[in-house]
Design a protein with these regions (language model features):
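Short, solvent-exposed coil/turn segments at beta-strand boundaries
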Residues: 79-85, 145-147
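Mid-length scaffold segments of soluble, non-membrane domains
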Residues: 84-119
């Protein structure tokens, strides 16, 4: 597996990513997706669940992958000090979309997200301070979509 220090573009990062980051797509499937995208073909493969995964966008520093019909993974290469880190946003859609953000260092070690990004709190989505409690009480579940 390549480290981020060796792999400085999204193609290489996607191929070098640990399999647990993409449990539905083993290395060969990811390699096929990249090959199809670079050949300007529809980048689509059958994933390990028998569904379809599609590489929707592949740039030197960004990737958008539809892992299933209801889930996506976005990866963005970010400068951080004198090295790069990778931001990974995993989203799941049902009636609403929910996202989680992860950061990785040059050796694919997960970084503490709290040091790099603060998830918005539900209170930040409502303006009138006298009605916040009312709306919070109405929310059964707190979902956030990030892009």
């Amino acid at each position: 597996m390549l480290s981020l220090a060796t792999a400085q573009n999204m193609r290489s990062l996607f191929l070098a990513a640990p399999e647990q980051l993409f449990p539905l797509l083993p290395y060969n499937s990811r390699a096929d997706l990249v090959d199809y995208a670079e050949a300007n073909m529809t980048a689509r493969v059958t994933n390990l669940l028998g569904g379809v995964s599609t590489l929707l966008e592949l740039k030197s520093d960004f990737m958008l992958l539809e892992t299933t019909a209801s889930s996506t993974v976005q990866m963005k290469l970010l400068p951080f000090g004198n090295e790069n880190i990778v931001c990974v946003v995993k989203s799941v859609s049902a009636e609403a979309e929910d996202s989680r953000v992860y950061f990785y260092d040059s050796h694919w070690n997960r970084l503490n997200t709290d040091d790099l990004f603060t998830m918005p709190e539900i209170r930040e989505f409502f303006l009138p301070s006298d009605t916040i409690g009312h709306y919070i009480d109405m929310c059964d579940i707190y979902l956030v979509s990030l892009k």
